[in-house]
């Protein structure tokens, strides 16, 4: 069960890669917009990567109580990161592309919805009883299933932003580059709680 959860969470790395993907006056405006987003996004990308690494490293050989604690913290961290990413997109203003306002609104709404879903998963994990191994395993399976749904939302949230001129502009920004994950030995403590 834990390996399924870890596999599902690693799919969340797609969001990190999605943020990694973003000529003329339009190109300059797109680059400026992408810089605003990516400068604010970098700490959130790192927070997500650390949270995902904590889940994966704990799931491999952790005790139920350790898995519960790591998953709970990771889901809270990812929810906070998604909220901050939504704020970064909102604060950057309207992207300088056709339907920019709708694009921004959709991305912000989807990121905020994803954050809410991660908090719901956190609650599910918190409610599991790690002393009853069978119920705990069954509960983790439900969490893994929910995680798959959320990851599809995560991917959709930024897929449109990473296309076209915006996608090219975001790809050039250091702040939107793939985060480096902490080593498995550092575990859940690698992700600071402060945003």
Predicted feature residues:
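Bacterial signal peptide processing site
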Residues: 23-26
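Bacterial N-terminal signal peptides that target proteins for export
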Residues: 1-10
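Short, low-complexity, Pro/Ser/Thr/Gly-rich segments in the mature regions of secreted, periplasmic
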Residues: 171-195
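C-terminal motif of bacterial Sec signal peptides marking the signal peptidase cleavage site
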Residues: 17-21
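Alpha-helical segments in soluble extracytoplasmic regions
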Residues: 44-121, 125, 139, 143-160
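Post-signal peptide N-terminal segment of mature Sec-exported envelope proteins
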Residues: 30-51
């Amino acid at each position: 069960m834990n390996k399924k959860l870890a596999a599902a969470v690693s799919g969340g790395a797609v969001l990190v890669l999605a943020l990694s993907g973003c000529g003329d006056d339009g190109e300059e405006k797109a680059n400026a917009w992408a810089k605003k987003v990516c400068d604010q996004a970098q700490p959130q990308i790192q927070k997500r990567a650390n949270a995902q690494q904590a889940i994966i490293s704990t799931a491999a050989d952790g005790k139920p109580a350790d898995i519960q604690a790591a998953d709970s913290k990771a889901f809270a961290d990812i929810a906070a990161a998604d909220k901050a990413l939504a704020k970064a997109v909102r604060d950057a203003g309207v992207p300088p592309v056709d339907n920019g306002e709708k694009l921004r609104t959709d991305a912000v709404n989807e990121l905020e919805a994803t954050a809410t879903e991660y908090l719901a998963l956190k609650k599910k994990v918190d409610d599991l009883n790690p002393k009853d191994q069978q119920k705990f395993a069954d509960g983790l399976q439900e969490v893994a299933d929910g995680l798959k749904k959320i990851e599809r939302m995560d991917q959709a949230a930024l897929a449109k932003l990473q296309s076209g001129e915006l996608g090219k502009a975001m790809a050039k920004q250091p702040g939107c580059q793939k985060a480096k994950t902490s080593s498995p030995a550092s575990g859940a403590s690698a992700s600071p709680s402060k945003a």
